[in-house]
Amino acid sequence: MGSKSTRKLWAVHLAKGSKVTGKKEPTTMTLGKAFRGRVLGIDPSLRGSGFAVLDYAADGTARILEAATLKLHPKLSMPECLGAIGNQVDDFLNQHSVDHVAVEQTIYVQNFQTAQILGAARGAAIGSAAMRGLPVFEYAPLRVKQAVVGMGRASKEQVARTVQNITGTNFELRFDESDAAAVALCHAFTWRDTSV
């Protein structure tokens, strides 16, 4: 079967009585309903995970309800650390009526063992949320920084300052906490409910 050129296809189309008008049919694009509610942001790490519960109101204001850094002793075994991460997520979910969970994706690492450890820490956090049937969303660090600060290569200090300015937080956040809050803000700013 030979292929027809665009010119021949148009000739056949016009020969059948179709008209070409300069007007295009208007198209509508639906972005979906913006996120409103509470999101638990997680910056996972085996020894120092950050957590932040963010309330994103209908008027677009965001405030941090609670933030914490889970620092674990180097002598704890990996399974003990993973259990502690899962328990911390459970504690946040028990204390706050969370609608969504947002987790920072693992950045590219060259060391295979480091990648495995980070993946396990993420799995412990995601597993706790998934066991409750909560929707879990993952965001790359560059996307988080772009959505919150406006620059994909922003420093931790810039992220922390921007998070404090956006949320009106009057207490100092550790970097792990501000990173977790930034993941939650990224989700609140960018997620759309396309089911409506």
Model-derived regions, located:
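Phosphate- and other anionic-substrate recognition elements at nucleic-acid/protein interfaces
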Residues: 1-196
